Amino acid sequence: VSAVDRGEVEAGVVPIENSTEGAVGATQEALITSQVTICGEIYLPIRHALLSKTKSGPIRVLYSHPQALAQCRHWLAMHLGETKLVEVASTAEGARRASVEKGAAALASPWAAQIYRLQVRQRDVQDRPGNCTRFYLLGHEGARATGKDKTSLLFTLPHRAGALHKALGVLAAKGLNLLKVESRPAPGKPWEYVFFVDVRGHVDRVDFRRALLQLEKQTQDLRILGSYPEER
């Protein structure tokens, strides 16, 4: 997220939600403090593999992203209960480390084995079949309306009774379908929360813009994170 925000890259792909573990908090927090635009979403089935430089031998340390470790926790407890688990920024970074450290392994996509010249010691080590992750496509320009779109919003609320009910009621009154609502602690503000809301529709629609004008009166720090084609 930060690389796109700083202009170091033109676009980025980040995980936002997993069907097993829920929201990816690190991505949500990065979105709060950045000015990037969500311009798309994709859903990908997640299949984790155990990778190392050799097909056999003891594994001293295992590297992977926190979400991947969580998605395989039961398998890891059963098969690698004594192995040190180390969280890294991405599954790719875990694979890279496993490729240069003796006695190290990684949880990553089988494709990473080809990139980093690793051996696949075990496939499909995720605890639940059908595990799927939703990713955001990030950039600086919004996507055009397609007729089947989704808009992601971010806002905080005033400290008064029924504030969330009133805010969401604005969307309902305008006939907008609420797809998701989730809260996250506000960075640097103990016991205050940021709300992430997904609504069906595109910000270019007249009725949607009218709803946002009303929503702005009921919320604080309202931001449109992006409108983009709905994949599901």
Predicted stretch roles:
Residues V1-R232:
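Domain-level signature for soluble enzymes in the chorismate/prephenate branch of the shikimate pathway
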